[in-house]
UniProtKB/Swiss-Prot annotation:
Its EC number is 6.5.1.4. Belongs to the RNA 3'-terminal cyclase family. Type 1 subfamily. Signal peptide: none annotated. This is RNA 3'-terminal phosphate cyclase. The active site is at residue 316. GO terms for biological process: RNA processing. GO terms for cellular component: cytoplasm. Gene3D superfamilies: RNA 3'-terminal phosphate cyclase domain (3.65.10.20), RNA 3'-terminal phosphate cyclase, insert domain (3.30.360.20). The keyword Ligase applies. Catalyzes the conversion of 3'-phosphate to a 2',3'-cyclic phosphodiester at the end of RNA. The mechanism of action of the enzyme occurs in 3 steps: (A) adenylation of the enzyme by ATP; (B) transfer of adenylate to an RNA-N3'P to produce RNA-N3'PP5'A; (C) and attack of the adjacent 2'-hydroxyl on the 3'-phosphorus in the diester linkage to produce the cyclic end product. The biological role of this enzyme is unknown but it is likely to function in some aspects of cellular RNA processing. SUPFAM superfamilies: EPT/RTPC-like, RNA 3'-terminal phosphate cyclase, RPTC, insert domain. It comes from Gloeothece citriformis (strain PCC 7424). Pfam families: RTC, RTC_insert. Keywords: ATP-binding, Cytoplasm, Ligase, Nucleotide-binding. The gene is rtcA.
Length: 350
């Protein structure tokens, strides 16, 4: 059994998600201890517990420690990941807490199901647009399109918006199995073709998304960036608001999000999102910071090496390198000065 310290590095839930994915894929039993030990509320939250149960379901794992606030987990797969029709609901684990992010569950089970022998359909219920996690709009516009370049084929449909803390969102994901991933090189992003976005609210007046969209477009215009932001008023189980922007470059896309909250003007939400976008645009890296650590897992499973240049080598990225290295599946090297990441899958090691 492989022992992994969940408090290492930035010590967050990413260690858990990466470990679960690789355990399911390789069949390697793991013992994860000190889970999220440095957090204000250590241990497994509802979204982390749902990740555990989802990963266990697809590989029929024997699990010990799968309860809220647990800081110790044993996870023993008994079969390779199995394709199928699955439904995972964060509310099943929340016990009065907030609705966690379905995108984190998606990223936990995506690659195990992609290498399964058949197609899979997954329904995820909970928070679709939640702070401190990638919103489903980012997954749809940035993450999955890039993985398609590696050879992973998916279809994603947002059925209902779900905000923190009520949740109530729903996502349908179709994953084509038997995936053979190929490495990629992401060193140049090319020219900016356009910026597109969505300013959305649920259960709030229609003037709010209109104000957010207008403010976004005005700020982009002032920066001499062409962009169109669509205002949208949708139905949901609770009020919520957000701006989701995508910068489309010649070779890659980058995504940026800002969520509304009570008392925060619509224009401030828009400005937050645009400032993130312009800050990245002023750099020359093709891969933005948050995508940087999310690319490692698919790249170590590819048939050929990958390399990419990232806007910032974050603690999340360094922590993910450390977590992955314990499975011995790849050689990952970081060039801190040039912000380069080199990934050499295990079957390419000499």
């Amino acid at each position: 059994m492989l022992d992994i310290d969940g408090s290492w590095g930035e010590g967050g839930g990413q260690i858990l998600r990466t470990t679960l994915s690789l355990s399911a894929i390789t069949g390697q039993p793991i013992r994860l201890y000190q889970i999220r030990a440095g957090r204000q509320k250590p241990g497994l939250s509802a979204q982390h517990l749902t990740c555990v149960r989802a990963a266990a379901t697809i590989c029929n794992a024997e699990v010990r420690g799968d309860k809220l606030r647990s800081t110790l987990l044993e996870f023993i797969p008994t079969r390779p990941p199995q394709a199928g029709h699955y439904t995972f609901d964060v509310m099943d684990a929340q016990e009065g807490g907030s609705a966690g992010a379905v995108t984190l569950i998606l990223q936990t089970i995506l690659l195990p199901l992609a290498i399964a022998s058949e197609e899979s359909t997954v329904i995820l219920k909970g928070g679709t647009h939640v702070a401190w996690s990638p919103p489903i709009s980012y997954i749809e516009q940035v993450y999955l399109p890039l993985l398609s370049k590696l050879g992973l084929q998916t279809e994603l449909h947002l059925q209902a918006w779900g905000w923190y803390p009520q949740g109530g969102g729903e996502v349908h994901l179709h994953i084509k199995g038997n995936c053979q991933l190929q490495g990629v090189e992401l060193l140049e992003r090319g020219a900016l073709k356009q910026v597109k976005g969505l300013a959305v609210v649920t259960e709030l007046p229609s003037h709010i998304p209109q104000r957010m969209a207008m403010r976004c477009e005005k700020l982009l215009q002032q920066a001499h960036v062409k962009g169109y932001v669509q205002p949208l008023r949708a139905k949901g189980v609770a009020p919520g608001a957000g701006v989701f922007l995508t910068s489309e470059y010649e070779h890659i896309c980058a995504g940026f999000a800002a969520l509304g909250r009570r008392g925060l003007p619509a224009e401030s939400v828009a400005q937050n999102a645009v400032e993130q976008l312009l800050s990245f645009h002023q750099q020359d890296a093709p891969v933005e910071e948050f995508l940087g650590d999310q690319l490692l897992l698919p790249m170590i499973l590819a048939q050929s090496p990958s390399q990419y240049r990232v806007a910032h080598i974050s603690e999340h990225l360094k922590t993910n390198v450390q977590t992955i290295s314990q499975f011995g599946l790849a050689q990952i090297d970081l060039n801190l000065e040039d912000r380069l990441v080199f990934v050499k899958p295990g079957h390419n090691l000499t």
